[in-house]
Amino acid sequence: GLGVSFPSIVSQHGETLHNLNSDGVLENGRLLLVDAGAESLENYCSDHTRTYPVSGKFTQKQKDIYEIVLRAHDEAPKNMKTGAMYMEEVHKKALLSLAEGLHDVGLIKGAPQDAVEAGAMYLFMPHGLSHGLGMDVHDCEAMGERSYDFSEMKERAIASGTCVYRAAWRLHEGTVMSNEPGIYFIPALIDKCRAEGLYKGIVNYAKLDEYRDFGGIRIEDDVLVTETGSRFIGDKLLPLTVEELEAVVGSLK
């Protein structure tokens, strides 16, 4: 290939998005997030993320959160199909999957759908599920937005904290996009939302205190939208399951 498609992110602070500081010493019990990609000879970019247990074994708490993210990662391509509107049919469905998992571990109270509609998932995943991929690793970011009428969504978006970015994105056959759900525990963001009284009755802030030093987990692969649905790009995915990731780290010790 032609080298990396962007500066690699290798960090034990996965809760800090796009963290390029990778000079820390690995510590047992921490999670190591690796977000990297390569550029092909034809100048097309890839983008992948895996999160590894530094010790070689996930703790039960880490495993629980990882499995929630993995389920969202595996389910998302089912919604990535020709004609789908990204925000409503892809991004929000992934948020709902994450919310259901967070509800199961006690971090969200009430109906998971209410957490999505209230914008509470912003606290756990403050970024989009996907971005376009092409000759730029974030390709064609404003696709369709010049002619899109945001007026109907604006008031609701402001009230809920829901991002309208990429809301005009309609998927087509041949679209290449990332699939990167994540769950992050960002102390400053938790404190801010709590102090402002946001998401009361939805987020279990008392339980959330147990995760302040957790870090973050993201899983990312690249997807091609086809005539009949979508598929992951590549003959074989990088190690993905809890068992596979533990085996990778174990082989290095």
Where are these regions (language model features)?
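Active-site neighborhoods and metal-handling regions in enzymes and metal-associated proteins
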Residues: G1-K253
